[in-house]
């Protein structure tokens, strides 16, 4: 595993994918399909997980400090912030602090939801931090004023998703309690789209579908985020996938066995850094 400063000068710079935990793997999976020539570094701030309960200024300071180190160590081509909470809070500050770096953000997919809905009833399933952020409400004001948008902030679902991804049991009753507020049945109309505004949630989409009181479109933004990154990352002629990258970094420095095994399933070794 290489830091960019240790790599040969002609090696393609890696793509850095950042999340509070392991939910950003949904974005990594799509990005790899579109950028096979690039190495990937997945950074999980598991020492700070979950982000939903943090005070805003403290979390913003933490994220900016982490990126001071990450950009110095790995000099990526682009950084994908695969976390709605992190980007809606600190995205503008990251771009201002590091103007030479390209950041691709993750925001609630409210615009495509508003374009697709037939009933006009859309729900946004997110963390409490994303729900209360002015950024989210600005998206609604800009793109969805013709819809009724319900914001559902789940305190527990990101943790449940982390457990579920690792193969640990999560009860149907507990999951249903988190997603049930998304479903509105009013005046002969029903919610027909639920925006998954946390990158952890798509891992549980099949569980959501099974438990939902009626079928809806569960909108996963991962592919759109990956397409945006592909658009911004140059594709050199005769590019070959570099050796030494494709690893995960955990800010705790101590991912458990189940997490290491999960990373291997995504083709990532775990950095000892």
Swiss-Prot record:
SUPFAM superfamilies: Aspartate/glutamate racemase (SSF53681). GO terms for molecular function: glutamate racemase activity. Its EC number is 5.1.1.3. Pfam families: Asp_Glu_race (PF01177). Coiled coil: none annotated. The active site is at residues 83, 198. It catalyses: L-glutamate = D-glutamate. Substrate binds at residues 19-20, 51-52, 84-85, 199-200. Keywords: Cell shape, Cell wall biogenesis/degradation, Isomerase, Peptidoglycan synthesis. Pathway: Cell wall biogenesis; peptidoglycan biosynthesis. GO terms for biological process: cell wall organization; peptidoglycan biosynthetic process; regulation of cell shape. InterPro entries: Asp/Glu/hydantoin_racemase, Asp/Glu_race, Asp/Glu_racemase_AS_2, Glu_race. Provides the (R)-glutamate required for cell wall biosynthesis. Belongs to the aspartate/glutamate racemases family. NCBIfam families: glut_race. This is Glutamate racemase.
């Amino acid at each position: 595993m290489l830091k960019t400063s240790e790599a040969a000068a002609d090696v393609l710079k890696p793509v850095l994918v950042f999340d509070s935990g392991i939910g950003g793997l949904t974005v990594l999976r799509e990005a790899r399909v579109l950028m096979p020539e690039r190495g990937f570094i997945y950074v999980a701030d598991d020492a700070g997980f979950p982000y939903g309960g943090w005070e805003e200024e403290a979390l913003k300071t933490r994220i900016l400090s982490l990126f001071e180190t990450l950009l110095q160590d790995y000099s990526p081509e682009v950084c994908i912030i695969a976390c709605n909470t992190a980007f809606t809070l600190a995205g503008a500050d990251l771009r201002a602090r590091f103007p030479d770096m390209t950041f691709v953000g993750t925001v609630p997919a409210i615009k495509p939801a508003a374009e697709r809905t037939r009933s006009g009833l859309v729900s946004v399933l997110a963390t409490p931090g994303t729900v209360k952020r002015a950024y989210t409400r600005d998206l609604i004001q800009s793109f969805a004023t013709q819809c009724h948008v319900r914001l559902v902030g789940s305190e527990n679902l990101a943790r449940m998703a982390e457990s579920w991804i690792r193969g640990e049991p999560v009860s149907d009753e507990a999951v249903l309690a988190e997603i049930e507020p998304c479903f509105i049945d009013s005046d002969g109309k029903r919610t027909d789209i639920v925006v998954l505004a946390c990158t952890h949630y798509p891992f549980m989409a099949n569980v959501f579908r099974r438990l939902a009181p009626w079928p809806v479109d569960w909108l996963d933004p991962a592919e759109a985020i990956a397409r945006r990154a592909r658009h911004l990352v140059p594709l050199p002629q005769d590019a070959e996938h570099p050796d030494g990258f494709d690893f995960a970094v955990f800010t705790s420095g101590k991912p458990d066995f189940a997490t290491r095994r999960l990373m291997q399933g995504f083709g990532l070794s775990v950095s000892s850094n």
